[in-house]
Amino acid sequence: MDKILKPHEKIGENFRKFYAKFGEDAFVNLKDFFEQEKESFYKEKIAQFRQNHILRDDAVIKARQSWVSVIGRSLEVVIEILVDNFCIKNNLKITNDKILRKTNLKNELDEVKRKILVDFGSVSLLPDGDIIIYKVIPEVKILAILSVKNSFRERYTETPYWKLKLSNQRITKHIKVFMVTPDNDDEISFKGNKKSRVVMEYELDGVYLARDKFDKSKKIKGINDLINDLKALL
């Protein structure tokens, strides 16, 4: 019996086909890909809600709400596909903050967790980390944290905050913090005095845009530059 895929897993499988067809260009066309996926998702969800005798207008609203909860994890899966082959070739591993928040971690992940905690005096907290890249040979060492966001909407200070906290600790100051985003709302893509672009460009180690049109700078680059910058950490 075939496994029933969760929505983000299904989108991940669809992206693998999209990637196979378009190669590296797939990552600069994420907006087109997700528009197609959203249309299919809406159609399927609305049909399901209608079968449960929900009025069409209400079904559309529910489908839209469902998509909002799916898109974030789906984008993370797509970026994981981008970095996965790189990590395999270079004997690196990937985890995330959700996994590290679990109890009874195996020794390796427990060490990763301890080496990424941020000290707040009487308590230590995990920084946000959608994708955490680390190596285990000759010892566990965290190389980079990737924050993956579809858009920001006044949340642009979250990742820079964690970068500052990590930089202030001896054990974590080497960790690079990168932002990966399609920037669907044009909040950081173009030069100007937008706080979001200024803050992230100044505080983060790199911002990688999954789109074709944007103003490039030393730190704000295309998503295809991400792998080269990760190689520099080896």
Kindly give the residue locations of the regions a language model identified.
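Conserved catalytic cores of phosphodiester-cleaving nucleases, focusing on short active-site segments
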Residues: 131-133, 143-150, 159
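Nuclease-adjacent, charged terminal/linker segments that flank catalytic cores
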Residues: 1-66
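Acidic-basic catalytic patches of nuclease active cores, encompassing PD-(D/E)XK
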Residues: 57-117
